[in-house]
């Protein structure tokens, strides 16, 4: 397998990260490194799909799968960076770099090496000479769909939860977050495993390179999760502590004690937020504090004095008197002259 495409991707990622380092010197946001990392993954997948020496089918799948996965992550991180302030990890990086400019440069360059290592499984999968859709190909596509949809779904659920002001200081227990405290890490691991399945058929020495991305994902998750949970305990206290006691840390699973435990049962179901139309109706129906409610003219009653009943029309029931026939008369009733 020719290593030249990997070297080209490394050079491209390094150039992108150097430009990003220059931009963040003015923007003062270290989250730009993660944004550019996702862009490098997407660009690397498209490049490998063009230049790899494998069959057409695996090259197309790598370009589509890797390109879409990187683009989704790029858009998610871009939206979060524009709307939300930098998280605690990036703030710590920025504070450390204020006294050491070269340290932030080294951080951005390390992200270029990280993106290149994560792209190696894409290149290996694109080098597969198998030109037919096998059972491994179908399994790889299925695992990829599960991983990517799980990543996207968990990110969307968490973003919607954070958008509601009433959820400040609370822990998201909605959707996938009911079953795992870190579903985004779990489904990212599943996503990267799909390229190992797509590369089945290559020699073991080459195929083993596809395990780089899942292994790195697991290492990153194990390193970041303790810091993330320590920050959550500091900001959310007992709410997050009870969440830890009932919810799996990584692999999605039923809350512990459900359905016998009341806390686990409450974590199992969280009412969905009201729709925008329902919220607008509730806002119009709920009076503001101190507002005076004026009844409509049709329902207005006199304030002083007794309530005078309104006259009512009484409809008399028409009673028909039956005709009394004389036994000896043959003249119809109504024609008798008086």
Which role fits each region the language model picked out?
Residues 4-17, 40-73, 103, 115-157, ...:
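Hydrophobic transmembrane alpha-helices
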Residues 58-96:
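A basic- and aromatic-enriched beta-loop-alpha substructure that forms the phosphate/nucleotide-
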Residues 328-336:
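Short, intrinsically disordered C-terminal tails of secreted or membrane-associated proteins
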Residues 278, 284, 292, 296-300, ...:
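Low-acidity, Ser/Thr- and Arg-rich intrinsically disordered low-complexity segments
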Residues 18-28, 75-81:
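C-terminal ends of transmembrane helices
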